[in-house]
């Protein structure tokens, strides 16, 4: 009876350790499937450019910091209690763009995991100004915009 209790306890501890370490292991697997890391450019945006970017990303209120660890990301995915923050959106856009040409794997689930991992990596290693500059450049290259600035706003 005691042997069965000990085995059950060991198995329970093992399951708890595996569940607790899963987000970190998934992060490592995802980041390992991407060649290299993106390098940021850092010129600050002009106020009109920042307003346009916030409009494009539908950011309201004060910018929130992006998620910077796999456990917080896992909790956000599991509970979905809040929409992605301004910082999360920016890091995801950069990660998606970078992984499109640097991912070692092509299956959808692997691309999604490497995108989540790269998004966390970018949030940890880039400043908000660097993310804003890169996302602004990427969205400016896109052919469609929902927020159109007036012609004089870009000269400020």
Language model region names:
Residues 2-156:
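Juxtamembrane regions of bacterial inner-membrane/periplasmic proteins
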């Amino acid at each position: 009876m005691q042997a069965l209790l000990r085995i059950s306890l060991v198995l329970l501890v093992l399951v708890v350790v595996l569940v607790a370490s899963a987000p970190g292991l998934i992060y490592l697997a995802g980041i390992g499937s991407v060649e290299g890391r993106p390098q940021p450019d850092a010129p600050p945006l002009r106020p009109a450019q920042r307003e346009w970017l916030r409009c494009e990303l539908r950011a309201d209120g004060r910018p929130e910091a992006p998620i910077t660890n796999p456990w917080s990301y896992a909790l956000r995915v599991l509970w979905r209690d809040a929409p992605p923050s301004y910082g999360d959106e920016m890091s995801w856009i950069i990660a998606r763009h970078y992984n499109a040409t640097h991912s070692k794997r092509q299956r959808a689930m692997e691309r999604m995991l490497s995108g989540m991992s790269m998004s966390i990596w970018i949030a940890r290693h880039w400043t908000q100004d660097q993310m804003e500059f890169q996302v602004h450049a990427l969205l400016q290259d896109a052919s469609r915009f929902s927020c159109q600035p007036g012609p004089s706003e870009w000269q400020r």
